[in-house]
A protein has these predicted regions:
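Metal-dependent catalytic cores of enzymes that make or break cyclic nucleotides
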Residues: 125-131
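Short alpha-helical hairpin
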Residues: 38-72
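Short alpha-helical scaffolding segments that buttress acidic/His motifs in well-ordered protein cores
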Residues: 62-70, 110-116, 157-165, 180-184
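Histidine- and acidic-residue-rich, metal-dependent catalytic cores
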Residues: 85, 92, 109-110, 133-171, ...
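Divalent metal-dependent phosphate-bond-processing catalytic cores, especially two-metal-ion Mg2+/Mn2+ enzymes
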Residues: 2-44, 78-86, 91-104, 116, ...
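Short, surface-exposed helix-loop/turn micro-motifs enriched in polar/charged residues
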Residues: 80, 102-111, 129, 149-153
Length: 239
């Protein structure tokens, strides 16, 4: 049976989800690949197709514009770059399938938030102020989508962006969409083993000019995660 692929030699998200966790190695290969610049519009639309969303109407132009914005890396980040965005999109959409996200509107919002949650990330230049980057990324996103969404959706998205501030455990996380995004943001460093987690920690070490070894940075990440924990059963079972 022909599979709908992300790119040559990669099976569809549906195939990966239907064969999970035996198919984890397929997702890992695509998530870790950083030789080729991602085509975000293609990845996002194919993920939406796999979530049974084939018509995005008013969101098509928005997604094209956001895909272009997210393709830039003006601050030369080695962790919060296009490949981090790519991994969060794919893992978020996988979790949406595994945890049975039902609303079509939520599926579209999921892809938009996963793509842009670290939009224009400042990397080592980020101001040491809680929620600074999260609010900046949301502000940059809001310039694009403000006229297309309701106030209710606007504040819902804003809450999710603020919740991605990793050092603080967000309160009252009851939103299925929010749970998916929060788990997807960190799962790439957890679900593929310690060696992969260390590889991402090394990228982050270089980005923020961390003075100590990458394994110390990774252990600090795991310690913080202990106090936060993953939200979805499908996320926990994937590790």
């Amino acid at each position: 049976m022909r599979q709908y692929i992300f790119e040559k030699h990669y099976p569809s998200l549906s195939y990966i989800a239907n064969n999970w966790p035996r198919s984890k190695h397929l997702l890992k290969k695509f998530v870790l690949s950083n030789q080729k610049k991602p085509d975000f519009y293609e990845i996002c639309t194919k993920c939406l197709n796999d979530l049974n969303i084939f018509k995005i109407r008013d969101y098509s132009s928005i997604l094209k514009k956001l895909s272009k914005l997210c393709s830039y890396n003006f601050t030369y980040n080695s962790y919060h770059d296009q490949h981090h965005f790519k991994s969060v999109i794919l893992i978020a959409c996988l979790l949406a399938k595994l945890s049975k996200l039902k609303s079509n509107d939520d599926k579209i919002l999921l892809v938009i938030i996963a793509l842009t949650h670290d939009l224009n990330h400042q990397g080592r230049r980020v101001i040491n102020k809680p929620y600074y980057q999260e609010e900046k990324s949301f502000k940059d996103l809001s310039y694009v989508i403000f006229k297309k969404i309701t106030y209710k959706k606007y504040y819902r998205i804003k809450k999710i962006f603020r919740s991605t501030f990793f050092p603080v455990k967000p309160s009252h996380v009851n939103d299925h969409l929010e749970k998916i995004i929060l788990d997807a943001d960190v799962l790439a460093s957890l679900m593929f083993g310690i060696k992969t987690g260390m590889k991402f920690a090394s990228r982050l070490k270089h980005e923020i000019r961390f003075d100590d070894k990458a394994d110390i940075l990774f252990r600090g990440f795991l310690k913080l995660l202990d106090s936060k924990s993953l939200y979805l059963d499908s996320s926990k079972k994937s590790c």
